[in-house]
Amino acid sequence: MIGNETDLHYKVVDLIRRYYPDSILVAGLGENQDTENKRLDSYKKGYMREQPDLMVLDYHKEYKGLCIEFKSPTNNYRVSKAQYELMNKYSNNGYKFILSNDYDEICIEVHDYMKGIRLPCKYCVKHFHNKNTLETHYRVIHRLSN
């Protein structure tokens, strides 16, 4: 049972790690900003207020990354003006942005996003669907062995 935003966050991360273990995940640390010293330290290290809860940074054919903002599954939430501005900022810069409290909806969006993931060749401009095709490309085109 998903009782709160944290449960939802954990469950989505578990899904991504299970089905897409090589994905590059970056978690926002907003919930950990509970003291003035932590907030100041995080700000100096580059943390932004209203940063997305989770980002997937794998190379995608259409997007620069996937941003997910989790909301409480109890339907007892509101979206702040700053969060709308954040969504627009990331969307306008080429990121796919999901704001949701629905695990099933998030799963569908994540799986849909992952279909567009491509692995770039380090030696040319081509991109590949999976490691096997990339490794074959390295062997055949660039004459590289594992």
Where are these regions (language model features)?
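Short Cys/His-rich metal-coordination motifs, predominantly Zn2+-binding knuckles/fingers
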Residues: 124
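Catalytic phosphate/metal-binding cores of nucleic-acid and nucleotide-processing enzymes, i.e., regions
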Residues: 1-118, 127-144
